[in-house]
Amino acid sequence: MLTGLNHLTLAVADLPASIAFYRDLLGFRLEARWDQGAYLELGSLWLCLSREPQYGGPAADYTHYAFGIAAADFARFAAQLRAHGVREWKQNRSEGDSFYFLDPDGHRLEAHVGDLRSRLAACRQAPYAGMRFAD
């Protein structure tokens, strides 16, 4: 039986740039690195960066990875990333504050204030087309 998400592996073209981005801008802790990769950690998230020199970037779809952030930290975090020239890929149109940004390889990321419970509460007030709740 599955117990949850174990780790996330992202292909990256420039390993040092990606380590710096995740460690220095996003606050991940570097646990280990080797010629072709690195292990980082943020809370209980284990992130593996895997060097793929010919990596062409992620697919152009809505797939993205969202990180939780406290409401009190959100504005400062978004301002810091903007000040470092981090590119945004989407404007927030949903419940809770969200900052949608790209890593150096174009992986779509999000910093989101809230959780599944707050999203479901908002959806109960204004459901998406065809939305049905399990309870």
Swiss-Prot record:
EC number(s) stated in the UniProt entry for this protein:
2.5.1.18
What cofactor requirement does the entry state?
Answer: Mn(2+)
Domain named VOC: residues? 4-114
For this UniProt entry, the molecular function terms from Gene Ontology, in alphabetical order, are: glutathione transferase activity; metal ion binding
Identify the keywords attached in UniProt to this record, alphabetized. Antibiotic resistance, Cytoplasm, Manganese, Metal-binding, Potassium, Transferase, Zinc
Name the residues annotated as catalytic in the UniProt entry. Answer: E110
An example of a Gene Ontology BP annotation on this entry?
Answer: response to antibiotic
Mention any one GO cellular component term assigned to this protein in its UniProt record.
cytoplasm
Which family is it part of? Belongs to the fosfomycin resistance protein family.
What name does this protein carry?
Glutathione transferase FosA
Q: Which gene encodes it?
A: fosA
